[in-house]
Amino acid sequence: MKIVAKLLVAAALLVAPASAQTAAPFSASVESSIQSVLPRMIAWRRDFHEHPELSYEEVRTSRVVAQHLRSLRLEVRTGVAQTGVVGVLRGGRPGPVIALRADMDALPVTEEGDLPFRSRARGRYNGQDVGIMHACGHDTHVAVLMAAATVLASQRHNLAGTVIFVFQPSEEGAPPGGLGGARRMLAENVFGDLHPEAIYGLHAWPQTSGTVTMISGPMMAGSDRIDITVTGSQTHGAQPHAGIDPIVASAQIINALQTVPSRQMDAVGSPVIVTIGMVQGGVRYNIIPQTVQMQGTIRYLNPDTRERLYERIRRTVTETAAATGATAEVTITENAIPTVNPPALMARTRAAVARALGEDHVNSGLPVMPAEDFAYFQQAVPGVFFFYGVNPPGVTQAEAAPNHNPRFFVHEPAMETALRAMLAVTLDRVGGEQR
């Protein structure tokens, strides 16, 4: 596309070597292909960043991806989970099947900053006109996986196995009542008649550029949505005794819910977060309303505690409401299950990445409470998910804008680290003499 062609020259001038150069180099042929694709990878990323698309609206993104995969002579399926793309690369020799996944959707965020390729896109979200931005780094995920496909396709005759490239829509969340991208792709038989023995994914994270973070076991939280309706009895604001005040009840419920993680669950063995992010009630300053609506999110790391957590939340909400004379209805909807990296597979993955980047560029870490629907792929296939750092040199995690922030920033040379990590885990499985 024209925008990609224009950006290639600029990207070629600005791409700098990642700080994590290979400790144990890839074969000369692989290394040559890596160096060749780096300017294109940056150009793809800038193109996607300038043209972000919301969940299940990734029409342009998926078209660019599919055209590129076809140019590599991969088997390509489009329209998987509406806008998803799947490419299959068959090596020259038989061997295992693995899958690599990247998510494609952007967020309803208006970008701030002065990047020459910053997003000016707008769209509709929840009935509102919104800015659209790749504020979570998915533009880099897509570009890195396209680059990985390019390198691996150049080595197809030396590969012993098959690689499935999964470009997933709607990681950030489906419309109410719908399925997110990972679950929908699985429901639509994303792998066809292939049976991958492992799947890998990564995510841009505000940590040191040139490093990756590998977390064994629970890595990211499960995420559920909570909807609460508190019903009282409407009355004049000057006569609260004549009714039941659902606003006061909702305030007490919000406070009481904070005892669930701190007093009702094991804070060490079963860390939990309960956040109420929306409260809506009343239409006039001197009327106590009939109802109050609340919405929030629940986060947890231990799948075994989920039902107990639900029970404690429902009990806390309904009994706190009852103490004020009000009633409360609670609905909890699953958004994502915890992302859990199998220790044995993580150990193999970490070793492969350390050989490629150097041990000092591979970090361990603690679980984090954001969620990621890659976990549903892990239910179907053993899988590993890891972070790659995108902070510019000298910028700490505390100083960097977090994911979902209008100033979220990716230090582009970090993408080479991500590419090398993905190639390392792939060639460890299907590389034969190319690993």
Describe these PLM feature segments.
Residues A11-S19, V37:
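Hydrophobic h-region of N-terminal signal peptides that target proteins for export
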